């Protein structure tokens, strides 16, 4: 009998120390370490961009495999919507910051806590790796406010219905890996030739003089060289963002908390209640496409603003950091610089944010694991590696000072602290088209600018009201 007990004991020790220890782990832990495949869809990143993050995460959670798929922008939204409707969509997917409210019902918000299995080495003599369950707190609302630039909290924190507690509550619906901002690209040679030592910092007479000095017309009044890309619509990169930034800088309220579109109204905070900031911003913008104005430098017959800048025919171009690789690749000899987006002198600085967030589908069977990965990827130590590879401005406050001196992305990163955006409704593309119509109609009929502005606001409001969004 004694001999049998000794044999059984030795057998137990053998099983425990030869890799079969997991058999003795409780069922909950065994379930947590079963192989999991997370499908991740995006637009701008490649598999290589995420290699370092994926490898680092794999070391922590070897049983989780993340499959990244890059789609074309022009097919992305349609594919996402169809895939989610057919229950074949990704666990994690990227969306533009202005799409969050539109996709809110398709997203599982970040949970308060996440329980995950981690490999832990145990044993003094015979080392053995065994799984261990750990429950950790997710980022809370205060963390989002403190860790990320202000625009992030404004965009990713939304009120939704909490099924567990049967009440509305604020939750986090996505996290960004970067925040891009609108900046001023300028052709150094054209400014030098015009006797302009520094790019203008404000939208005042200095900017307008710079535009006049760098605009060249032929004998018939045709534009040979343009001082800046303002005043037009579809042939200007991100025209709606530029005009939105001008309106916000001038004091217009684009939308209130009740989702009412208001950029045609005079806000109560404006001292002169006869001054309409949204209307005057629209007038200022479209003056650059008005042949009767001294600052005339743009019309609908010109080519794309980015292409003209790369061809050396445009002195000042407004764009994001993502335009930089294109300029470098297609115009390697272009002598250009990057400066801050101009402001209204005497007003607090306001910049425009345009970025993407990573979020989790409410159809995912592994929402906790998906959110765990997103939070892991958004941490400073992981973000550093990613940002260095893709050359994008950070969304994290803690990394801004490290990027400020970067000649490529320093300006964009610094501006993130004062960047804002606004929700354009369930169909942001439709809202942008409404802005295009508003701009083009104003150029043709300046005397009807107030009616044009009011009509545009009404149309944008319709995009906001679709499906109760």
State what each model feature region is.
Residues 209-215, 246-299:
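Glycine-centered hinge/linker elements that transmit conformational signals in sensory
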Residues 192, 384, 415-469:
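Conserved C-terminal helix/tail region of periplasmic/extracytoplasmic solute-binding proteins
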Residues 113-147, 200, 219, 233, ...:
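Short, solvent-exposed loop/beta-turn-alpha elements that line the ligand-binding surface or hinge
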Residues 32, 157-160, 164-167, 332, ...:
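Long, aromatic- and glycine/proline-rich binding clefts that accommodate carbohydrate-like moieties
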Residues 2-8, 14-136, 298, 345, ...:
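Conserved N-terminal structural module of periplasmic/extracytoplasmic solute-binding proteins
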Residues 70-79, 203-209, 296-310:
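Short helix-initiation/N-cap motifs at beta->coil->alpha
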Residues 65, 166, 181, 194, ...:
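Extracytoplasmic/periplasmic substrate-recognition and gating elements
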Residues 100-181:
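Hinge/lid segment of periplasmic solute-binding proteins
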């Amino acid at each position: 009998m004694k001999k049998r007990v000794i044999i059984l004991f030795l057998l137990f020790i053998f099983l425990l120390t030869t890799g079969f220890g997991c058999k003795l782990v409780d069922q909950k832990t065994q379930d947590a370490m079963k192989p999991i495949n997370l499908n991740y869809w995006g637009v701008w990143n490649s598999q290589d961009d995420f290699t370092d993050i994926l490898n680092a995460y794999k070391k922590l959670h070897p049983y989780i495999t993340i499959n990244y798929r890059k789609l074309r922008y022009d097919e992305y939204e349609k594919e996402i919507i169809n895939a989610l409707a057919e229950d074949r969509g990704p666990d994690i997917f990227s969306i533009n910051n202005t799409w969050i409210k539109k996709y809110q019902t398709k997203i599982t918000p970040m949970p308060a806590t996440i329980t995950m299995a981690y490999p832990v080495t145990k044993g003094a003599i015979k080392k053995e790796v065994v799984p261990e369950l750990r429950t950790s707190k997710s980022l809370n609302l205060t963390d989002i406010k403190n860790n990320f630039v202000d625009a992030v909290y404004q965009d990713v924190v939304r009120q939704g219905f909490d099924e567990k507690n049967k009440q509305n509550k604020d939750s986090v619906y996505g996290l960004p890996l970067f925040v891009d901002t609108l900046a001023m690209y300028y052709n150094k040679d054209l400014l030098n030739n015009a006797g302009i030592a520094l790019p203008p910092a404000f939208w005042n007479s200095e900017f307008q003089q710079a535009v006049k000095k760098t605009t060249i017309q032929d004998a018939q009044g045709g534009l040979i060289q343009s001082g800046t890309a303002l005043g037009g619509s579809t042939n200007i990169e991100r025209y709606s963002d530029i005009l939105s930034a001008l309106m916000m800088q001038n004091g217009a309220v684009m939308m209130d908390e009740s989702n009412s579109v208001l950029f045609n109204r005079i806000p109560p905070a404006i001292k002169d209640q006869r001054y309409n900031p949204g209307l005057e911003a629209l007038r200022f913008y479209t003056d650059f496409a008005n042949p009767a104005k001294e600052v005339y430098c743009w019309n609908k017959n010109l080519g794309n603003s980015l292409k003209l800048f790369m061809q050396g025919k445009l002195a000042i171009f407004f764009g994001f950091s993502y335009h930089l690789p294109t300029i470098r690749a297609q115009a390697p000899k272009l002598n250009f610089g990057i400066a801050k987006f101009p402001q209204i002198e005497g007003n607090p600085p306001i910049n425009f944010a345009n970025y993407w967030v990573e979020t989790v589908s409410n159809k995912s069977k592994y929402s906790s694991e998906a959110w765990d990965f997103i939070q892991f990827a958004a941490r400073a130590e992981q973000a550093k590696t990613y940002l260095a590879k893709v050359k994008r401005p950070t969304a994290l406050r803690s990394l801004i000072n490290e990027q400020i001196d970067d000649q490529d992305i320093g300006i964009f990163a610094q501006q993130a602290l004062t960047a804002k955006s606004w929700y354009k409704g369930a169909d942001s593309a439709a809202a942008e088209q409404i802005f295009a119509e508003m701009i083009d109609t104003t150029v043709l009929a300046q005397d009807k600018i107030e009616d044009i502005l009011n009509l545009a606001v009404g149309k944008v409001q319709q995009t906001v009201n679709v499906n109760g969004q």
